[in-house]
Amino acid sequence: LIDPGHGGEELGAITHIWETKNGVKKTKSIYEKDLALLLAKKVKKYLEKKYTTYLTRSIDRTVTLNERANMAETVKADLFISIHINSSNSKRSSGFETYYLDNHADMAIKKVENIENKFLLGDEKEVNQILIDLVIQKTVPSSKKLAKFVHDNLSSRVKKKFKMKDRGIKPGLFYVLALSKRPGVLIEAGFMSNSKELKKLRSSEFIEAYSLSIADGITSYLNTLPPKDIPFF
């Protein structure tokens, strides 16, 4: 199950660019929800050649945390792949990173968690820590392994070709991963707050290369498992 972050009234990160049309210069808003959907659709295109693949949303619509979690149960997803675009108050921040669900004490990572988790709607922000710990216990070995396969593919293809900073594989307490209750990763594809990186994120060449890297990483991970041997609740 591929999860394009945010959607609908949940915009995610926002940045603004200048565009000139018919000789008139105007500002245009760029939303994380739209960039995430573009990437997710491409990942699905590559994976569905071999695997049954679903999206939590295929259009710009609001999807609650519970709806995402319920969809994972309904389709009996083996893996949960959440795709996001990063943002920072510093316009110099750059690079891609891959997260798996686990406890940690890194304050820099907590900032990323706060950004992604704060967009959740209503009382879904309150996620039971006991549930999180149970999911971590069940999924962390598989999720960590999946994160390595995905990130290694991104590093070998995207880092060199697009000269992007590799920010590594990290543990994180993301609610969307916790409630999916299965092995999964959350991918931050790059910083839309960085103007140079934003141009890459919006380019068709980057979207193709990045989505193919994710798909290849997932395929490599699945190829290491015996049939019917992907653990989930």
Which residue ranges define each predicted feature?
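Catalytic-core regions of hydrolytic enzymes
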Residues: 1-127, 133-140, 144-148, 208, ...
